[in-house]
Amino acid sequence: MTAGYRHHVFKLLLFLHLLAAIFAVGPLVGAATTASRALRRPDADAATSAARLVRLYSYVSIVVVILGMGLMSQKAPWDSSEEVAQIGDPWIWLSLLLWVCAMAVALGLLVPSLTRAAVEIGGGGSPSALVGRVAAAGGAIGLLYAVIVLLMVYQPGG
């Protein structure tokens, strides 16, 4: 593979990785961090919609990871003798660990809490006991992704 071709493949994968991150992680963090509004109103439809968005964009974020792995395996255009990164680089495995944590919070805590809140609101009950949990989960997801971006930019140990 020629250096020019390799450079174009690298740029294409970088573009797709960033585009996927913007269009998948952005809406995920937005939905997660604002989901508690649906419980404060209370609005069952908004809670159901927030749960659906968080679930959908959590799964779509897998594309970001796949593209990142593809990008990582490319030869660095600035030094064709080495790969962009390796799985053992601290910033890579820490980012993956934090992404798994964000997925666990989103799918294991936030989505079930929003679904339960929607049922409670629909039944005429109050979801007040879940507001704090939903707000904390949304904040945690936002913080986890902010740290992932920080790791991607500064690449400590890489």
Positions of PLM-derived features:
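Polytopic transmembrane helical bundles with strong interfacial aromatic enrichment
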Residues: 2-158
